[in-house]
Design a protein with these regions (language model features):
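Short, compositionally biased low-complexity segments
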Residues: 1-18, 100-113
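Accessory nucleic-acid engagement/destabilization modules that flank
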Residues: 4-20, 54-57, 68-71, 157
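Short Lys/Arg-enriched alpha/beta "domain-start" segment
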Residues: 10-54
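Conserved ATP-binding subdomain of kinase catalytic cores across diverse folds
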Residues: 61-227
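C-terminal low-complexity, glycine/proline- and small-hydrophobic-enriched intrinsically disordered tails
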Residues: 1, 49-66
Length: 227
């Protein structure tokens, strides 16, 4: 549901586990993939399966990434269609209480143990966007995260100042950092290195090409069956 206010939702989904342990709870994973996600994903602009009939969604992988204030998850989804094919999507996920929300775009109300709040796309939370920026600056590599942060030679900023979305969301989500850098988040995931990333990095670091935006950094998702 696009830009929906949290007050329009029905009662929250209730789970016994704490949010920090959500993806070790089989009940949460089952409800999240079916009852919660199916109604949400079909209305997103980046969802590429609108011409087909959704059969079911499966959580095939996940990782946890934390800031000083919050726990977030990166979730790899496999969307299966009745036409006998599937697509992979990446969703960064947050759970926020009402006073922590930076957005009115809600996935679903939820309750983990005694704590009520909302499941939201983590990219809508400034704390999460800052976390991505800081990890690129530090060029952090942590195999447990299944993420590889790379800082390019042309990236000189060391301090996060601001972030905002660029234009309408299409097949990807673009975020402007410090009014100077654009991070393009690809929602649909392919089991290979993204050609946009390869070309941009090659032109900047190998060819020193000046007529296109310089490559300044990247985030790669390391999957068991590919990149």
């Amino acid at each position: 549901m696009e830009n929906a206010n949290q007050d329009t939702f029905a009662n929250p989904f209730k789970f016994k586990s704490e949010w920090k342990n959500a993806f070790t709870d089989e009940e949460f994973i089952k409800v999240f993939a079916s009852d919660i996600l199916e109604n949400y994903i079909i209305n997103k602009r980046w969802y590429g399966g609108k011409a087909s009939t959704l059969k079911y969604i499966e959580v095939v992988d996940h990782f946890k990434i934390t800031s000083k204030k919050n726990t977030y998850y990166g979730v790899l989804l496999e969307v299966n269609f009745k036409e006998a094919f599937y697509q992979h999507y990446f969703m960064p996920l947050a759970f926020m209480t009402s006073d922590e929300l930076d957005t009115s775009t809600i996935i679903s109300p939820a309750k983990f143990g005694p704590i009520e709040g909302y499941l939201v796309d983590a990219l809508h939370q400034e704390d999460f966007r800052k976390l991505l920026f800081d990890n690129i600056v530090q060029a952090t590599e942590n195999p447990e995260l299944k993420l590889i942060f790379h800082k390019g030679m042309q990236f000189h900023d060391k301090e996060y100042k601001s972030s905002k979305f660029m234009g309408l969301e299409q097949s990807n989500t673009s975020i402007i950092f410090n009014d100077a850098f654009v991070l393009k988040i690809f929602r649909r995931i392919y089991v290979s290195t993204n050609p946009d990333y390869e070309i941009s990095r090659f032109l900047t670091e190998r060819m020193h090409f000046k007529s296109s935006p310089a490559y300044t950094g990247s985030i790669n998702l390391a999957l068991p069956e590919g990149n």
